[in-house]
């Protein structure tokens, strides 16, 4: 049986990345609450320092 978690960095960034969060009002609320809480990483995009 195939497992449910099949990791893919592209899917991860597209679904939970910074630009995706900024695209909706609720996503911006997520970012605001994470900023308020003082999270080091706001989104999964912050784990990468590529392009």
From Swiss-Prot:
One GO MF term attached to the UniProt entry: structural constituent of ribosome
Coiled-coil region(s): none
Region ranges (Disordered): 1-51
Listed HAMAP family: Ribosomal_bL34
A Pfam family it matches: Ribosomal_L34
Record keywords, A-Z: Ribonucleoprotein, Ribosomal protein
CC per GO annotation: ribonucleoprotein complex; ribosome
Protein's UniProt name: Large ribosomal subunit protein bL34
GO annotation, biological process: translation
Compositional bias ranges of the Basic residues kind: 1-16, 31-42
Family named by the database record: Belongs to the bacterial ribosomal protein bL34 family.
């Amino acid at each position: 049986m195939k497992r449910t978690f099949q990791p893919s960095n592209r899917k991860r960034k597209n679904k939970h990345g910074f630009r995706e969060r900024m695209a909706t009002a609720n996503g911006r609320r997520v970012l605001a609450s994470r900023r308020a809480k003082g999270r080091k990483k706001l989104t999964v995009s912050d784990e990468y320092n590529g392009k």
